[in-house]
Amino acid sequence: LTVRSIKRQVDGALGAHGAWLLEPYEDMQDSTGLVLETIEDIEGTAEVAVKHGFQVNTHAIGDRANREILDLYERVWEEQAVDGEPLRWRIEHAQHIDPLDVPRFGELGVIAAMQGVHATSDGPWIPRRLGEARTEATSYPWRDLIETGAIIGNGTDVPVEPIDAIASYYSSVSRMMNNGEKFYPEQSMTREEALASYTVNNAYAAFEEEVKGTLTPGKYADFVVLSQNLLTVEEAEIPNTDVEMTFVAGELKYSRDDSVAAGDLKRLASVADHDH
């Protein structure tokens, strides 16, 4: 068990008009959202965290919330005279970001801890909250974040979404919504970027890149064998991917095929040979 992070929450969710926005909601003109924990309170936590070398992970969904937390992180680091990048502070969700703030993630070394599946689940109704122009400019700008040097971590935000890494990976590369339309696909990740967001980037965000995140000698060898290659299969077939086997510390812990004995690597080797 490792305890090295502190979670705070500055705003609510966009669907409930709780995300803190720079401008009023398109469908609720008298509101810019909610502030659930004050900037002053979160800043106090951040100051203590710096002194003890802790990571701070702050929930921020709206563009105002993201700007305020970026400002807060930068301000605390300057006041404490520390280099913030090694602290690996994160913004959880980072869903709607003003274009002026996008490059600040990479510049400051703030990790965007996002959930790919949120974009496609929320996509059909986001324009009702933000309007088309603001949605296109601010919502889930993964391509812009990556191209300005940000590290993106990925997940599902369970229980808000099912704990299905394949579904979130598919959303990350396709931006395909359940209505059959794509949500501003120009902001999609490449397949390699999406895979990194779920592996090496998440390991980095958890200070575990020396033991997790890649299949490298000396690491834990925690990995899964999938029914098809996520990097080459037709995009529409990605959701049909099954987990064939799960290995923990190099040992077989789960197999969809009951005939595979624990520790039997022959099938794994044949899959690897086929893919190469």
Locations of regions flagged by a protein language model:
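Metal-coordinating catalytic core of metallo-dependent amide/deamination hydrolases
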Residues: 1-67, 79, 104-111, 116-117, ...
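Short conserved micro-motifs at the rims of enzyme active sites and ligand-binding pockets
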Residues: 14-16, 103, 235-237, 257-259
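His/Asp/Glu-enriched, well-ordered alpha-helical/loop segment
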Residues: 46-57, 64-89, 93-94, 99-103, ...
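Extracellular/periplasmic ectodomains of large secreted or surface enzymes and adhesion receptors
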Residues: 256-276
